[in-house]
Amino acid sequence: MCIRDRMSEVTIYEVGPRDGLQNEKIPIETNDKIQFIDFLSDTGLMFIESGAFVSPKWVPAMADSNTVLSKIVRKNDIMYPVLTPNLKGLEDAIKYNSDTACVFATPSESFSKKNTNCTVKEALHRAKEVTEEAIIKGLKVRGYISTVMFCPYENEIEPIKVAKLAEELIKMGCYEISLGDTIGSGTPIKTKEMIRDCKEAVGVEKLAVHFHDTYGQALANILASLDMGIKVIDTSVGGLGGCPYAPGAKGNVATEDVLFMLNGMGITTGVDIEKICKASEYVFEKLGRVPSSRVFNALQSKRKRNI
């Protein structure tokens, strides 16, 4: 039985405004970021990760998250998650009416120390503190696991380590776990092996996937994930993003590219690819460069030929 015979709908979880923009050395203007999110709110997306309440010293591009969350035009049926790595971040998220807090962990001790300056155990303790308090305050909590297949410092990661971490995050109260191929070196077989173990630990309905396209494997890995029953995919308009603590990591898989593939498979997302392209065009114009999305560039070229 082919994938489209078993699956008719997939949820796109847009991470461009946070994971996509967080590494920009010259951040775009706050008003431009607000407009970008407002454009995304008009595309049919149900989840738009919109900011991060983190130290401006370490992530200056997210220093305006309070203003952004205050001024975006929210729609009742859309969630606007924010990254909250500690209780201070959660306090700010609550202050600015965030609906979803995001916590993160990694099975790699080396990556954990580089990324958050703490051990895996300490990171889990922080995540537990944030998750429990967020739930008390009425927020939903999403968990991220980085380096789920390969680590830039420890090489290959055992799937069972990822599964155990996912189980810990679900136990503490996360409603969903996003499995991140941080350096983009995962392949379809590795993807299936990792998801298999995580499915056994927490159930496939609790899992999402988050791929970077460093080695051009993202769409193939998404296809493999769909075959394993995954129904939530993290994407970033135009391929925005990377990871400052993962040398060589390129952008997230482009929203446009994923939508084009899913549309061609007859899988519904509810997201308008043309409106996504307009949002992508807007933010990349502000950044002064061209989107890496192949679909965006192909559609732009097609439009120019038809003028």
Residue ranges and their predicted role:
Residues 4-307:
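Catalytic cores and adjacent flexible loops of soluble metabolic enzymes
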